[in-house]
């Protein structure tokens, strides 16, 4: 299982810090993007998922092409694998005392692989060479989240998203964004008081009392097309290398609506502000690995992943609509922004992986991986000097840190059936921060299990993986506004069908 938006706890905190700048310019890249596109959770086959992805020292599974390419050299026959997967993501939010649930279901392709093995017939020296080509899913961003609540009139603690627009317009009148303030002004939501010399909004003037709703729809993922070569030396030493082509897709559709349901705000009825971000990218990477069997019981593996170099294109736009008490409820104003097209480059951190596995004959396997990566090494480049990416790179170095990931799994052989279980821990890429007076970390724990059936020519594997995450989400600044507490439950059910030949 690969967590969906696992960096969200920190990403939302970053929104708090960066939101004051958000209204000044078009959307800028930040450390949240760097983390999102750098994290890999190795979906692959159902067997690998059931064992927590701990295949760095095992091999003999197409997931190895993306994890430790030396595992391709372990193959002693050719095979084809196909792994469709059902994603189920459920979120529950608590905002202003109200609990709201949302969900998303989707089928994806986790794996499609072809391995061709050529044995030499020798037990000493070069015993075989294997070529693999195929696809492994590395990360998924699919999630829906809904928040609802009512700002209590006259409480002294209420707020509105329009306060952001108004405050920024008054604090920075010389900076006017076509994506934010201009839309609020054109939708008649932010009038100007020429006597006071400032902008204002109906909701704040009336003392609040409006209902709020925000829905975030995220989709996409990262997949790797892997071209792998593996070799077997004396059935003790295995080598492998992968050239990987990554395809990245990420979409975020956010709509924020506020309504005067109680009819206590003069003139104002409702407004909706929408943000759309669509991201596509292609990246290239190279991986190399080794597996050593000092004795038949033990396997030791090591792998190194060079940084992935992405070229990314983003399309970003917003729109705002409003209705007032003197109309029929249809949008009296609808104001779209221009579409901003932006291209940039991202270099992700390298990864180093150490693995060990114990094989108890044909009875059982126990395996574990340790993975290290330093998120501070992520780097943006626009091939220009006017997009502020140099400042974002400084922020990456200051906000992010190195992280350790640990995966463990076990498999028990019971006749034609195999029972599997696994767990994985992905360390937080963020330095400790304060949220509501408490330290928070964006680490992830995933539990998994499954079973498999194998014959000489055909095998079928099933897996189930579950992740639970909790994080805070602030809809807007100021920082002392009420945040939403989000609980996410992500499940993946995968099935792999394979044929040996």
Q: Where are the regions that the model predicts?
A:
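Alpha-helical transmembrane segments and their juxtamembrane interfaces
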Residues: 20-21, 78, 417
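Outer-membrane beta-barrel porins/channels
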Residues: 29-43, 48, 117-501
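Bacterial Sec-dependent N-terminal signal peptides
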Residues: 1-32, 497, 501
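Outer-membrane beta-barrel translocator/receptor signature
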Residues: 46, 58-67, 73-151, 223
């Amino acid at each position: 299982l690969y967590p969906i938006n696992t960096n969200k706890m920190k990403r939302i905190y970053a929104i708090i810090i960066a939101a004051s700048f958000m209204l000044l310019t078009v959307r800028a890249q930040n450390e949240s993007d760097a983390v999102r596109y750098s994290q890999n959770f190795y979906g692959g086959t159902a067997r690998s998922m059931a064992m927590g992805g701990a295949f760095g020292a095992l091999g003999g599974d197409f997931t190895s092409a993306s994890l430790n390419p030396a595992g391709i050299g372990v193959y002693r026959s050719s095979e084809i694998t196909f792994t469709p997967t059902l994603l189920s993501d459920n979120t529950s939010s608590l905002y202003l005392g109200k609990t709201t649930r949302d969900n998303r279901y989707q089928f994806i392709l986790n794996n499609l692989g072809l391995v061709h093995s050529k044995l030499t017939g020798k037990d000493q020296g070069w015993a075989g060479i294997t070529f693999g080509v195929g696809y492994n899913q590395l990360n998924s961003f699919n999630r829906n989240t809904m928040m609802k609540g009512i700002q209590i009139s006259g409480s002294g603690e209420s707020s509105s998203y329009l306060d952001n627009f108004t405050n920024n317009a008054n604090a920075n009148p010389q900076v006017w964004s076509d994506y934010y303030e201009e839309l609020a002004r054109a939708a008649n939501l932010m009038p100007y008081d020429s006597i006071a010399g400032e902008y204002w909004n109906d909701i704040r003037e009336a003392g609040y009392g409006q209902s709020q709703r925000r829905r975030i729809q995220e989709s996409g993922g990262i997949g790797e097309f892997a071209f792998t070569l593996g070799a077997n030396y004396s059935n003790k030493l295995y080598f492998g290398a992968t050239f990987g082509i990554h395809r990245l897709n990420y979409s975020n559709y956010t709509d924020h609506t506020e309504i005067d349901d109680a009819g206590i705000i003069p003139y104002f009825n409702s407004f909706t502000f929408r943000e759309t971000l669509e991201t596509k990218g292609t990246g290239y990477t190279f991986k190399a690995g080794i597996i050593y069997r000092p004795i038949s019981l033990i396997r030791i593996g090591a792998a190194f992943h060079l940084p992935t170099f992405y070229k990314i294109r983003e399309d970003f736009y917003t729109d705002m609509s409003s209705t007032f008490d003197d109309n029929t409820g249809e949008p009296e104003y609808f104001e779209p922004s221009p579409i901003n097209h932006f291209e940039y480059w991202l270099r992700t951190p390298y990864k180093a992986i150490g693995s060990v596995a114990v094989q108890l004959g044909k009875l059982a396997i126990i395996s574990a991986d340790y993975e290290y990566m330093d998120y501070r090494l992520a780097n943006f480049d626009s091939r220009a000097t006017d997009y502020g990416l140099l400042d974002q790179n400084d922020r990456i170095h200051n906000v992010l840190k190195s992280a350790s990931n640990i995966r463990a799994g076990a498999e028990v052989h019971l006749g034609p059936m195999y029972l599997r279980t696994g767990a994985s821990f992905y360390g937080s890429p963020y330095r400790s921060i304060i949220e509501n007076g408490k330290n928070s970390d964006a680490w992830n724990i995933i539990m998994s299990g499954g079973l498999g059936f194998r014959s000489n020519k055909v095998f079928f594997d099933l897996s189930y993986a579950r992740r639970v995450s909790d994080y805070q989400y602030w809809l807007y600044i100021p920082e002392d506004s009420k945040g939403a507490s989000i609980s996410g439950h992500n499940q993946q059910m995968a099935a792999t069908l394979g044929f040996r030949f």
